[in-house]
Every structure is written in structure tokens, then in C-alpha cells.
Amino acid sequence: MVSGDFVTSDWHFAHPYVAALRYFQKVNMTANDLRTYCQTHGVYIGEYVDTETHDNIIMNRLNRLYTGGDNKIIVAGDISSGSTGSLDKALKFIEDRCAFPKDKRILVCGNHELMLTKKNFTKLYDVFGEVHTSPLQYSDNIVISHFPVKQRFESDDYWNEGNRRKKFIKYAPIKEDNKIYLYGHTHSMDWEEFGKGISEFNIGIDACRLTAAPIQYFVDLDKERKSENL
């Protein structure tokens, strides 16, 4: 089933704060400082962030991957901020601009989708051919989810500092032997943020340089890492 399918996560279209985290702000301030400034002064952060350029760059890179064949794109959650305004803009943007046809778009929900109202959640089906609210068993040995495996929520890894993400543990897959886990959520820029040779790969847009990656790449990388450990 791998063939030419692609995987990605955490697009965050129409989400100024995340665009600022990716250095698309128009002012010389960090994303967190900018957010604090806007909250303190009661101004909209979007006025200081080039969200449109952020979204267009990502979409342009994604569109280069579609060849008109049967290859699908699996999005492991967080297509927007989760607010109604952001969601509506993101869905329209995907519908209008994404080269992958609707039946080739698969969504595995992240926290920003799981928090949606029922009314807003149903909008996802207008743009995606499949919508999954739990980890996707992509093949016999590949699991795609928004969240890292449950064991990561129980560890002291940097991203889980203060256990602030514990509330999402119920959505995370349980790690099993001889399976590859592809996930997003952490916004790490490292595919192997939790270590090499453990069959866990971050496929978020930050790790993939603002585009998607072939699933086959991670299958091959997993084999390579295992051979290194022999």
C-alpha cells in the first residue's frame, strides 16, 4: 500500500502564531514575545504575521508532489488553529489550492480537529476523502497518528515537560514490536527526535521542511537504522 503515498502533519493554515513560530512574522520579535505583546495591547497577532505567504509556500511545495497518479497524501492532523474562522479559511484554501483531489486526501485528526464542535467537525468531510479520529493502521506494520506513541507521554522527554500534554494520551497509539510509527504534534525539526533505531519518525511539516515526505522514505530509513544496529 506504500507505493507513492505521502505523509505530513501540522499544516496550521490560517494560524498566525504557528506561522510566527516558523519565522513568518513581519516584526523583529520571537513568536512568543509577539503573542505576549498582542495579548497585552489587545491587538490581533495576524496583523504582524505574513500568514498568507506561510500558507502559500507550504501548499506550493505540497502540490509539486502530485503527479496525477494514485498517490495519496495523508495529513496527520492540525490543519488549522481549530477556531471556526481559522478552520473555514484552511478548508477553503485546501479545497481551492490543493492539487491532490479530495479522494486522495486522508486526514488523521490532531488535537485541533478533536476539539472541534460537531458542526465544525462535519466540515472536514467536505474537503477530505477520509477522516479518522484514531490512529490509522496504514499497513500491517505502519501506524500513522497525530500523536507520538503512548510511551512518550509517560516519559520525561523535553516536549512533555510538566506533563502538560497528558490529556492527549488517550489518542496516542500503543507501541508494538515490528511496527513503524509516523506522527506529528511536537513541531520538532528532527525526524528522529526521540532517537535512532526505534521505528518512530516525526513527519510534521517542520521536520519535513514545509512539505510532505514519501512514506517509503521512512520504511527505507527504518531498515537502514536496524541494519546499523546489527
Each predicted region: which residue ranges?
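Core catalytic region of metal-dependent phosphoesterases/phosphodiesterases
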Residues: 2, 6-8, 13-138
